[in-house]
Amino acid sequence: MEIWDAYYLDGTLAGSILVRGKPIPEGLYHLVSEILVRHTDGEYLLMQRDPRKPNYGGYFEATAGGSALKGEDAYCCAKRELREETGINAGTLTNIGRFLSHDTIYETFLCVTDCDKNSVTLQEGETVSYKWISEAEFIDFVNSDAMIDVQFQRYLPHLKQMGYIK
């Protein structure tokens, strides 16, 4: 059973818990961290979702991420999820945005890493492949139908700031 802290809309702790799979009460939210990974050489990491996943199975996504566990803030969640889903140990993460959707608060981060590109690991049931793509290929990716739309919306402020939107 996965236990989460409940949050108010403004991101403050509500003092109650939520359980994955159970309805989230009106006025409460759960916290999700997402991480965009860029190598110091300018390439971006894309992870291919397991085809068995119910949502967007088989799609490549420009993220690692997931729900914050009870007692975990967005930053700690991002570091844990990145390590679990890619094997990358982030030094510093930069918060690049906040997005609200239904009963979820998304905190998005950028990880700039100099990791060995061949050391990326896959998480059973989550991902089946990965690839590093150039900045030009990443710009094409975010401006195409290949990028998961809800993920695009969450990264949009950062993508605009970087001049990546055509």
Predicted stretch roles:
Residues 85:
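Short alpha-helical functional segments enriched in proximate histidine and acidic residues
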Residues 1-34, 40:
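Acidic, metal-coordinating catalytic segment for phosphate/diphosphate chemistry
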Residues 21, 58, 101-117, 121-166:
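Nudix hydrolase/Nudix homology domain
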Residues 10, 39-42, 50, 112-117, ...:
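Short loop segments at secondary-structure junctions
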Residues 22-33, 39-80:
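Conserved Nudix-box catalytic region and its N-terminal flanking loop in Nudix hydrolases
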Residues 89-97:
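A short coil-to-beta-strand element that immediately follows conserved catalytic motifs
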